[in-house]
């Protein structure tokens, strides 16, 4: 029985890591394009997208192409899903929408071009993006540490 439990824990740990790794590899190029255009670190973009969409597997992520939990019209006639979250025609549009939202905030000009991911995450969280800013920041920073540290 102990061996079975160990095997299950190992499997689920690997699956979780594998899913995170897949999300980061699938959207790395898109996030880098967004970094070039908006000067927001690509790893911040990826970590927020991963957290808010469950690695792209959440209902909102799949049906509304919304990887960032952005609130707005869900367009149920198009998406087939009524929600308080915004519908995007493509995942790419969701990434653009996130970067445009962040670039409209007061802290953006001060951080634009900075590679300090902690400052970005803390500013986004304290700027009203997350209901529980402290927990959200801690989680996003942990995702960044796991996937973006060299």
Positions of PLM-derived features:
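Catalytic cores of secreted/periplasmic lytic hydrolases that degrade extracellular macromolecules
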Residues: 16-150
């Amino acid at each position: 029985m102990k061996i079975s439990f160990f095997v299950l824990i190992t499997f689920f740990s690997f699956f979780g890591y594998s899913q995170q790794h897949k999300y980061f590899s699938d959207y790395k190029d898109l996030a880098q394009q967004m970094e070039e255009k908006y000067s927001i670190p690509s790893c911040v973009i990826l970590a927020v997208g991963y957290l808010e969409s469950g690695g792209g597997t959440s209902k909102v992520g799949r049906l509304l192409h919304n990887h960032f939990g952005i609130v707005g019209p869900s367009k149920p006639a198009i998406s087939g899903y009524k929600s308080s979250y915004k519908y995007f025609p493509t995942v790419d549009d969701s990434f653009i929408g996130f970067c445009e939202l962040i670039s409209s905030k007061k802290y953006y000009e001060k951080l634009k071009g900075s590679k300090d991911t902690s400052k970005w995450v803390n500013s986004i969280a304290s700027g009203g993006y997350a209901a529980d800013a402290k927990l959200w920041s801690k989680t996003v920073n942990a995702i960044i540490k796991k996937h973006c540290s060299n």
